């Protein structure tokens, strides 16, 4: 089982501001804010519409401070996969509530989502009725294949980038936009900021020498990465 210190690091330590998480996950900051804090919309001539928070965030009086623990950014990472599959986020809440009930309180950051989540969600769709809003949400995420229900390819690709600890909860996330640079978010290294997985060096730490005119080879030798990894990292940052 994961130790108490690691659990605290993943759940209780604020590592990311919303702006940082927005950059790392390639999600609009405003979208992350609604996931972290919920929202209230007041359309003209209609009742107010409220949405509750759907990722783990720690309170802070100003938005410029770190608010997301690692488990929160892991949940947001999976939500972003759902979003990229084309699922309307304003309709996802009933499906998430069903996942939490059947998988656990941090279902989006759980390995059980990868192994059982598609079947769990499909049962929810069947209960909701064919053609219902919840059924359409689930069908946006899941497809039948060889007699089983599996997540669509884009969702599966995101889930495959997550590593899990012995407690079945996320412990590391590979950021796919960095390509072969193999850059990860790991709360145990670099205070959770993007690091090269092989060397543990923060991506931010290699930028200074490169911007100062050092060659790719010199920086690669100094920091234990390859020139190609540096180029991939720079391309991801510039995108």
UniProtKB/Swiss-Prot annotation:
Gene3D superfamilies in UniProt: Winged helix-like DNA-binding domain superfamily/Winged helix DNA-binding domain
Question: What is the superkingdom listed in this entry's lineage?
Answer: Bacteria
Query: Any idea which UniProt keywords this protein has?
Result: Toxin-antitoxin system
Coiled-coil stretches? none
Cystine residue pairs: none
Which SUPFAM superfamilies does the UniProt record give?
Answer: Homeodomain-like
Report any Pfam family annotated for this entry: HTH_66
Q: Its biological function? A: Possibly the antitoxin component of a type II toxin-antitoxin (TA) system. Its cognate toxin is VapC45.
UniProt name for this protein: Putative antitoxin VapB45
The organism is Mycobacterium tuberculosis (strain ATCC 25618 / H37Rv)
- UniProt lineage: Bacteria, Bacillati, Actinomycetota, Actinomycetes, Mycobacteriales
Q: Which gene encodes it?
A: vapB45
């Amino acid at each position: 089982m994961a130790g108490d210190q690691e659990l605290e690091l993943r759940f209780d330590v604020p590592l990311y501001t919303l702006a940082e998480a927005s950059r790392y996950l390639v999600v609009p900051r405003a979208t992350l804010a609604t996931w972290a804090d919920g929202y209230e919309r007041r359309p003209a001539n209609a009742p107010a519409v409220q949405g509750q928070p759907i990722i783990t965030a720690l309170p802070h009086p100003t938005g410029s401070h770190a608010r997301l623990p690692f488990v929160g950014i892991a949940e947001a990472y999976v939500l972003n996969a759902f979003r990229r599959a084309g699922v309307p986020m304003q309709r996802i809440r009933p499906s998430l509530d069903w996942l939490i009930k059947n998988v656990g309180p941090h279902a989006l950051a759980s390995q059980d989502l990868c192994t059982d989540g598609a079947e769990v969600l499909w049962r929810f769709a069947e209960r909701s009725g064919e053609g219902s809003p919840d059924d359409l949400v689930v069908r946006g995420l899941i497809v039948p294949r060889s007699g089983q229900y599996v997540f669509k390819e884009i969702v599966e690709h995101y889930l495959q980038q997550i590593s899990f600890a012995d407690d079945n909860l996320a412990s590391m996330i590979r950021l796919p936009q960095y390509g072969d640079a193999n850059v990860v978010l790991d709360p145990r290294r670099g205070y959770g900021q993007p690091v090269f997985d092989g060397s543990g060096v923060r991506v931010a730490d290699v930028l200074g020498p490169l911007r100062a005119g050092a060659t790719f080879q010199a920086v690669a030798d100094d920091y234990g990465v390859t020139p190609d990894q540096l180029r991939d990292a720079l391309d991801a940052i510039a995108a």
